[in-house]
Amino acid sequence: MLDPYLLRHDIKIVAKKLASKNFLLAVDKVNQQEALRKQLQIKKEHLQFIRKSKSRIVNLAKANGENITILCQEINQINEQLKQTKSELSSLKQLINDYMLLLPNIPADDVPYGSDKKDNIEIKRWGEPRKYNFPIKDHVNLGYITGNIDFTAGVKLAGTRFVVIRGQIARLYRALSQFMLDLHTQQHGYEEYYLPYLVNRTSLYGTGHLPKFYEDLFHIQSINKENISNIYTLIPTAEVPLINLLRDKIFDENILPLKMTANTPCFRAEAGSYGRDTHGLIRMHQFDKVEMVQAIKPEHSMIALEEMTKHAEKVLQLLNLHYRKVLLCTGDTGFASSKTYDLEVWLPSQNIYCEVSSCSNTSDFQTRRVLARYRNKKDKQLRFLHTINGSGLAIGRTLIAILENYQLADGRIEVPKSLRSYMQGLTILG
């Protein structure tokens, strides 16, 4: 959620920045609602002042034995007016808040202007694409050759965009998550969490996934009569429960930054993505991801974004996978993000780069929603934390990259050296 101060004092600047994210701010509506809010606030305070003054007069008159009937009638009238004014003010504040929840975060000043992904800026490349002296197979064919990736079984069990992975590829899949968690906890300073895969609506509002992305989520309601009012949602990312661990808390500055990581399944309905990335494992309804989150002081958040992106890059480097780092333009930057880097790994079968990590600085956008603050040591004032989140990495897409980049001519797969200790020394799959 944006700082209300910005809308009250710099609304033209805010409107311009939001327009760069393809969001049209209703400036007149915001100004009109703010003017009415001020009027109702002043009216409420005025009525409270009059009531207080009248109450003093009543007390004095009562002490002197005077008739207070008319005075009491006047106070009752004031109470009715005050009740009505409070109700109008409360309803207006709810309307303002509902609209505020629809506003995306403001892009940082150094984010390049652009309308969509074609305007993103490539920052760097690491490594070189491998060269092969045989026809390249994609991960779907490689999975078919090994017999370890079964899309037909996924459709049978659940439907399209589901898969069954077994045997050696399943071991490799598990090894990837263990490798990533060990790297982030042992070398990068993150604390590992086990989290609920179902969350409540409050948690999703806290991260900005609601109300905007309602149709992209899987919602669950119990048929048990005792729990029928409880509506849960399958997490789209571990970012949701991790960020909400900060909710309604005040942290000591001395313990910052907080660095958290978790490996969870993620569930996305992918509404509106029909026809996009439908090949194989690239865009599934259910996938696994190692997530990183940092909660940090505002003045350190951009440095933390660079650090977290390097943590994600380290995974790709240790796996010796060619990738590029991309700075997203304003129009492609996510709803809650002020600045985002994508890491895209090379897929030789399609001659394309595929996103395996997205690292974002959400500034105080999420912490304002969840009321996550810290106490400044110098002035003892409460301030909103900044949060950084990033994939470290998406397991399924990283698996795709390994299968395709480490394939041999006969369809077998070489195990990356950094994963062999997690595979009991196995060097070749198939």
UniProtKB/Swiss-Prot annotation:
What Pfam families does the record point to? Seryl_tRNA_N, tRNA-synt_2b
| Pathway connected to this protein | Aminoacyl-tRNA biosynthesis; selenocysteinyl-tRNA(Sec) biosynthesis; L-seryl-tRNA(Sec) from L-serine and tRNA(Sec): step 1/1
Record keyword rRNA-binding present: no
Q: Which CDD domains match?
A: SerRS_core
* Protein residues bound to ATP: 268-270, 355-358
The record's keywords, sorted A to Z, are: Aminoacyl-tRNA synthetase, ATP-binding, Cytoplasm, Ligase, Nucleotide-binding, Protein biosynthesis
What is one GO cellular-component annotation here?
cytoplasm
Q: Which reaction is the catalytic activity of this chain?
A: tRNA(Ser) + L-serine + ATP = L-seryl-tRNA(Ser) + AMP + diphosphate + H(+); tRNA(Sec) + L-serine + ATP = L-seryl-tRNA(Sec) + AMP + diphosphate + H(+)
This enzyme's EC code(s): 6.1.1.11
> Quick one: a GO biological-process term for this protein?
seryl-tRNA aminoacylation
Q: Which Gene3D superfamilies match?
A: Bira Bifunctional Protein, Domain 2, Serine-tRNA synthetase, tRNA binding domain
Which residues are recorded as binding L-serine? Answer: 237-239, 291, 391
Source organism's superkingdom?
Answer: Bacteria
Q: GO terms for molecular function, please?
A: ATP binding; serine-tRNA ligase activity
Keyword Cytoplasm assigned to the entry: answer is yes
User: Which cell locations does it reside in?
Assistant: Cytoplasm
* Domain observations: Consists of two distinct domains, a catalytic core and a N-terminal extension that is involved in tRNA binding.
Record's subunit section: Homodimer. The tRNA molecule binds across the dimer.
Q: Which NCBIfam families match?
A: serS (TIGR00414)
The record's similarity note reads: Belongs to the class-II aminoacyl-tRNA synthetase family. Type-1 seryl-tRNA synthetase subfamily.
So what does this one do?
Catalyzes the attachment of serine to tRNA(Ser). Is also able to aminoacylate tRNA(Sec) with serine, to form the misacylated tRNA L-seryl-tRNA(Sec), which will be further converted into selenocysteinyl-tRNA(Sec).
The name on file for this protein is Serine--tRNA ligase
Q: Which species does the entry assign this protein to?
A: Baumannia cicadellinicola subsp. Homalodisca coagulata
Provide the organism lineage as a comma list: Bacteria, Pseudomonadati, Pseudomonadota, Gammaproteobacteria, Candidatus Palibaumannia
